[in-house]
């Protein structure tokens, strides 16, 4: 299937996919366009491990991009499948996994289509920095809930929608500090935690805990915090029955 065909998927934004495809070759440059993703990645792993061990678990990484999180999960002992609709980015993910000899099963497919044929298959589903880039985040959340096993864990991360998140995640991060490429985010697509939780509960997921990601511009360091006002992560569990 061509990228043009993938762009027509009901829950794909062609401009978002094209933007990420254009940046595909910079995905693994830790000082480049996606440097911030590399820096927060250890925090994402740390957050997941608070609730579920990774070793020997079946894991689905939704919107895996170039594979930053997928590879880390695999190196921690997970049996990882990464899915995305950006073809060039997924090619980079596959090539990098070969270079690093890290086993990740990558597939060019939507979350919704994958969940149809892999229902209740995964111990863990992750969907990081992805919901704010799709037209219908609720559809992704429902697909994640469908793919995870009863009693399994689903982890989301996205951006809160408020004045502070606009100032820090768009104006400061994109325009001033160049932490992420200009045009990466659209403030209207940001999702408040209460909105995400309502969608997750409708999908049969139950909130266990949340955490924020805070950036210190002087030290250029990220840390987990209890404030969810800008970048945040939420941990959900599917009912065991």
From Swiss-Prot:
The keyword Oxidoreductase does not apply. Signal peptide: none annotated. Keywords: Methyltransferase, S-adenosyl-L-methionine, Transferase, Ubiquinone biosynthesis. Its EC number is 2.1.1.222, 2.1.1.64. Pfam families: Methyltransf_23. GO terms for molecular function: 2-polyprenyl-6-hydroxyphenol methylase activity; 3-demethylubiquinol 3-O-methyltransferase activity; polyprenyldihydroxybenzoate methyltransferase activity. It is an enzyme of class 2 (transferase). S-adenosyl-L-methionine binds at residues 44, 63, 84, 128. It catalyses: a 3-demethylubiquinol + S-adenosyl-L-methionine = a ubiquinol + S-adenosyl-L-homocysteine + H(+); a 3-(all-trans-polyprenyl)benzene-1,2-diol + S-adenosyl-L-methionine = a 2-methoxy-6-(all-trans-polyprenyl)phenol + S-adenosyl-L-homocysteine + H(+). SUPFAM superfamilies: S-adenosyl-L-methionine-dependent methyltransferases (SSF53335). HAMAP family: UbiG. This is Ubiquinone biosynthesis O-methyltransferase. The lineage of its organism: Bacteria, Pseudomonadati, Pseudomonadota, Gammaproteobacteria, Thiotrichales.
């Amino acid at each position: 299937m061509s990228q043009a065909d993938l762009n027509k998927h009901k829950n794909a934004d062609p401009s978002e996919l094209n933007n990420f495809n254009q940046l595909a070759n910079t995905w693994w440059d830790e000082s480049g366009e996606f440097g911030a993703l590399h820096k927060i990645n250890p925090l994402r792993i740390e957050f997941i491990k608070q609730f579920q061990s990774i070793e020997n678990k079946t894991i689905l990484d939704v919107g895996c991009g170039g594979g930053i999180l997928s590879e880390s999960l695999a190196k921690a002992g997970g049996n990882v499948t990464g899915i995305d609709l950006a073809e060039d980015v997924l090619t980079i993910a596959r090539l990098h996994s070969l270079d690093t000899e890290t086993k990740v099963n990558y597939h060019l497919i939507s979350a919704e289509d994958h969940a149809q044929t892999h229902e209740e298959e995964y111990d863990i589903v992750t969907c990081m920095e992805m919901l704010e880039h799709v037209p219908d985040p609720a559809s992704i959340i429902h697909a994640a809930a469908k793919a995870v096993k009863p009693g399994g864990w689903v982890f989301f991360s996205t951006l809160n929608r408020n004045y502070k998140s606009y100032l820090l995640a768009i104006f400061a991060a994109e325009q001033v500090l160049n932490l992420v490429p200009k045009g990466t985010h659209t403030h209207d697509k940001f999702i408040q935690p209460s909105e995400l939780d309502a969608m997750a509960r409708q999908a049969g997921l139950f909130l266990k805990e949340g955490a924020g990601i805070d950036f210190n511009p002087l030290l250029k360091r990220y840390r987990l915090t209890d404030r969810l006002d800008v970048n945040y992560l939420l941990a959900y569990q599917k009912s065991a029955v």
